[in-house]
């Protein structure tokens, strides 16, 4: 991640003025190598944390959500956790649920550690401790994510949560958390999705010929692509676009950019 480029983008977003209230999503593919189990991209996390520290010093407030990347998706894919209870492998699934939750806390600890290096205290809220159910309609009180204290930000992440029906468990995406945060916490001025390995929302996958950046997208505009289900057990770019569309009903500035 090029810090200078990122700062220029934030200027374009109108973030040079203070008193903004910003929700940032760090994509799992940005902060980890999604093809290798539990491999973080340390320099990218540090770069983002540096920018966040500048926002805080600018008297902005920030809520941080991060994805799972290779700390969650690979194990969840192996044991079909997104499908919920499967009788034939339920013992293995329950062990995988425990392991993924622990792995997500480990990844979150990395994020909080790098925030601390830049003088920011991250207060973590693992969804498995306070949320249940799936999609943006999940059950859980998110008001604590709106708490604001000097040099402190609230941090949460995509996680495996309980589901109070025959499914037993499922995956609550960070994108669904973003929708609820931007809808229910008052005063949000900006919502920023920092993506990994793509410059933003494209007309086609970045490796396909003719793929172009969409500078301003509406949900009437078609995007095509393939969801990399071998590495991502949520909705990939399609869920992000859908989530961004919902968020835009409440927040004027919604951005999807290359992290």
Specify the residue positions occupied by each region the protein language model found.
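Ligand-binding beta-strand-loop-alpha-helix segment within the catalytic cores
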Residues: 80-161
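Glycine-rich phosphate/pyrophosphate-binding loops
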Residues: 121-128, 185-202, 251-259
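Internal active-site segments that recognize and position negatively charged phosphoryl groups
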Residues: 109-111, 137-203
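Short, active-site-adjacent cap segments at secondary-structure transitions
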Residues: 30-32, 69-74, 130-132, 161-163, ...
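Polyanion-binding loop/helix "lid" in catalytic or ligand-binding cores
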Residues: 44, 48-51, 94-112, 167, ...
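N-terminal glycine-/serine-/threonine-rich phosphate-binding loop
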Residues: 5-63
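Glycine-rich loop at the start of a catalytic domain that most often binds anionic cofactors/ligands
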Residues: 69-85
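Glycine-rich beta-strand-to-loop/alpha-helix junction loops that act as flexible
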Residues: 25-29, 65-69, 257-259
């Amino acid at each position: 991640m090029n810090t200078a480029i990122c700062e220029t983008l934030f200027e374009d977003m109108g973030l040079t003025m203070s008193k903004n209230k910003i929700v940032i999503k760090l994509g799992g593919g940005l902060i980890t190598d999604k093809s290798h189990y539990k491999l973080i991209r340390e320099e990218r996390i540090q770069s983002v944390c540096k920018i966040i520290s500048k926002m805080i010093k600018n008297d902005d407030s920030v809520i941080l959500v991060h994805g799972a990347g290779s700390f969650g998706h690979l194990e969840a894919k192996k044991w079909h956790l997104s499908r919920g209870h499967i009788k034939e492998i339920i013992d293995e699934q329950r062990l995988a649920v425990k392991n993924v939750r622990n792995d997500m806390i480990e990844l979150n600890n990395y994020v909080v550690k790098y925030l601390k290096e830049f003088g920011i205290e991250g207060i973590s809220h693992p969804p498995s401790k306070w949320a249940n159910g799936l999609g943006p309609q999940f059950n859980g009180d998110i008001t604590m994510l709106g708490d604001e204290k000097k040099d402190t930000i609230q941090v949460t992440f995509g996680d495996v949560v309980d589901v109070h029906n025959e499914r037993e468990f499922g995956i609550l995406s960070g994108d669904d958390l973003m929708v609820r945060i931007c809808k229910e916490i008052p005063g949000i001025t900006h919502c920023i999705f920092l993506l990994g390995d793509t410059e933003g929302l494209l007309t086609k996958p970045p490796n396909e010929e003719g793929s172009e950046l969409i500078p301003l997208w509406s949900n009437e505009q078609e995007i095509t692509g393939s969801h990399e289900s071998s590495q991502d057990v949520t909705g990939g770019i399609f869920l992000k676009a859908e989530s961004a569309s919902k968020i835009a009903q409440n927040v004027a500035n919604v951005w999807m950019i290359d992290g």
